[in-house]
């Protein structure tokens, strides 16, 4: 299946839709989940157009994971998180709802993890810890 360049994350990357950005460089964007499962729930996406993890070139995947670690450390520091849930759903059958590969960083323990919330989160503490 061809990459859908009209998906919400592609539109965010092009600046067509707003996002609360936590981190951005020439290869990756990290931003707050619009319906967070916990305070500090952050999404990390490569700028490479790839629908699933398996579509992402190895070099881009490796770099994205480096940024995932950087953001996870910032979340732990900023929010005094005792743990981070890293979640990557690859493909519709796995529950992926946006057809652009992305990584969820959720400060929580698996026992506290809930469904997406109804309020937007605050990114300023995480930004300050970077």
Describe the residue ranges of each PLM region:
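HIT superfamily nucleotide-processing domains
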Residues: 1-130
């Amino acid at each position: 299946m061809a990459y859908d360049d009209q998906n919400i994350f592609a539109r965010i990357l092009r600046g067509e839709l707003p996002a609360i950005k936590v981190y951005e460089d020439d290869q990756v964007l990290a931003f707050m989940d619009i319906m967070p499962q916990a305070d500090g729930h952050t999404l990390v996406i490569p700028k490479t157009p790839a629908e699933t993890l398996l579509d992402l070139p190895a070099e881009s995947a490796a770099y994205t994971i480096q940024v995932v670690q950087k953001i996870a450390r910032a979340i732990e520091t900023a929010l005094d998180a005792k743990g981070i849930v890293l979640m990557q759903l690859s493909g519709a059958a796995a529950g992926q709802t946006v057809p652009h590969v992305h990584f969820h960083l959720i400060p929580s323990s698996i026992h506290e993890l809930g469904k997406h919330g109804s309020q937007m989160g605050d990114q300023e503490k995480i930004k300050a810890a970077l």
